[in-house]
Amino acid sequence: FGFLPIYRRPAS
């Protein structure tokens, strides 16, 4: 995941 501005985790 990495499409949410509040869910920009490095381990997508």
UniProtKB/Swiss-Prot annotation:
Keyword presence, Plastid: no
Any Gene Ontology CC annotation: extracellular region
GO biological process, one term: mast cell degranulation
Disulfide bonds: none
Listed name of the protein: Granuliberin-R
Function comment: Mast cell degranulating peptide.
Protein location: Secreted
UniProtKB keywords: Amidation, Amphibian defense peptide, Mast cell degranulation, Secreted
Expression by tissue: Expressed by the skin glands.
Highest taxon listed in the record's lineage: Eukaryota
Source species taxonomy: Eukaryota, Metazoa, Chordata, Craniata, Vertebrata
Organism expressing this protein natively: Glandirana rugosa (Japanese wrinkled frog)
Modified residue annotations for Serine amide: 12
